[in-house]
């Protein structure tokens, strides 16, 4: 496994974000995947990081117990012995499930992650090699700038916003130390979204560069009086086809790596939104409650974290699908009709694009796209309506009991 800077410009650019994610126990440090690290030092680093992950997991279990105790005290205080208890306990349990899943994923899929890094580095070099005969320059944004604006900025927002949104939400039964540790855990959970988006953007950059080579090839076929270079251009077309096939397989590996962690993140964020709405309704009768705006911010934040994941995946798929349009444009050129070798190569490439549909999935459990996010919003709105109906009935019953006790 290699992640040397000389091998891959993409992985070198992504390294700082991977380091931050490793601090929160989400992914192994990038140094573990370098051949320059001596075996003894690698073993010491891995042993130390394993102990660090165990400490994080123990902290999560401890805070799970503290949060459950605080939840029961809040439920007893507001007399809401209904589904609020079940929903709250399930939401707290999902935190433990996600943290445990992350640690097991690092342990069981360590080799798969190394292969993913290797394939990204090899694809990076392969695309550079296939484009060396073209003099045109790409006009897309700098990859470093794209990561800074999309991943870096969002990670800073997550780390900065979560403590403000959760401040004082746990009530008077929660010690400030537990609150700080809980905030760290919540940051860790939500950073799983940017981690996934980082890999999506790596794939996106590979597709952009592969498409750019194809566009340059099209320009050469338009301007060049084909003859001597037609065989060279056909070889470039075949290389481009093979690279796209490898990118498709890479996306499949990434989906398998993030299968359970992303599934649990979607489930946790959806359930937490319902949990926040439920407590917003319960606390609405408390004149001293000052956290309603924070609850609205939490709902928006949790939704937006999932939206970004779906949005980047959708953009990547659309860019991949645009390659078929470029192939059809090349097929319409007079050169494609003139040279049988080029015509057959285009036909094979187009058939491959028709069969290898790019989909970002959680290991085949569901597709990550804007359609998923829209369906999730509709489902949540339906559950919110049900919660509101139940709470209206509860408030009416409480009011009736109070009136009865006052008259008696």
Swiss-Prot record:
Q: Which GO terms describe its biological process?
A: monoatomic ion transmembrane transport; sensory perception of taste; signal transduction
Report whether Membrane shows up as a keyword of the record.
Answer: yes
Keyword Transmembrane helix, does the record have it?
Answer: yes
Gene Ontology molecular functions: ligand-gated monoatomic ion channel activity
> In terms of domain of life, where is this protein from?
Eukaryota
In which compartments does the protein localize? Cell membrane
What keywords were assigned to this record?
Answer: Cell membrane, Glycoprotein, Membrane, Receptor, Transducer, Transmembrane, Transmembrane helix
This chain belongs to the protein called Putative gustatory receptor 98c
* Biological source species: Drosophila melanogaster (Fruit fly)
